[in-house]
């Protein structure tokens, strides 16, 4: 971070302590310190919720998960009945989450795997969308009469399962059967 560690070459000071930073010194001397909470208590504490709030969007009204924000950042158009779902590539050994980043898979390799997965899906409403490295999306193109997911559809973030069994932490709630089926199929592909 900005403060870094004390260095012998700087007489035991951190780079920040040794730097000539009059503007920052002025702010520190005359500024005020406060705090703000940008994450409502009932929403997951994460940068997606906090950034939405910092940008002026009430997460109570607009937050529907990280994936729609990532889809928008990629220029993916979502209709009123479409769902963007985060699709992380992971490494599981003997039902234990070995690595939630798929060993830091390259974007190129992840794209190749997702293209293969798309070729195996017979449901035209589903499409895997490559992102960066292990962080990807699944887009479900729904309709007014076809909405399997709701805000009650839940999952456990892969990073929360590191070195733990994944056998009891599948998606749950409306539409989870579709997601679990895709997860199980992906093991066979």
Predicted regions and their residues:
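Active-site nucleophile/metal-coordination loop of metallo-enzymes that catalyze phosphate/sulfate
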Residues: 3-119
């Amino acid at each position: 971070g900005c403060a870094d560690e004390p260095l012998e070459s700087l007489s035991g000071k951190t780079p920040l302590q040794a730097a000539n930073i009059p503007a920052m010194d002025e702010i520190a001397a005359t500024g005020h310190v406060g705090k703000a909470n940008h994450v409502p208590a009932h929403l997951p504490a994460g940068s997606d919720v906090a950034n939405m709030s910092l940008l002026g969007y009430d997460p109570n009204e607009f937050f529907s998960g990280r994936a729609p924000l990532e889809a928008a950042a990629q220029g993916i158009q979502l209709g009123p009945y479409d769902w963007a779902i985060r699709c992380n590539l992971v490494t599981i050994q003997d039902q234990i989450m070995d690595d939630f980043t798929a060993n830091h898979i390259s974007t190129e390799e992840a794209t190749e795997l997702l293209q293969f997965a798309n070729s195996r899906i017979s449901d035209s409403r589903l499409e895997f969308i490559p992102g960066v490295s292990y962080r990807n999306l699944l887009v479900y193109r729904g309709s007014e009469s076809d909405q399997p997911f709701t805000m009650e559809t839940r999952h456990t973030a892969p990073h929360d399962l590191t070195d733990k069994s994944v056998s009891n932490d599948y998606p749950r709630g409306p539409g989870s059967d579709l997601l679990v089926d895709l997860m199980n199929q992906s093991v066979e592909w």
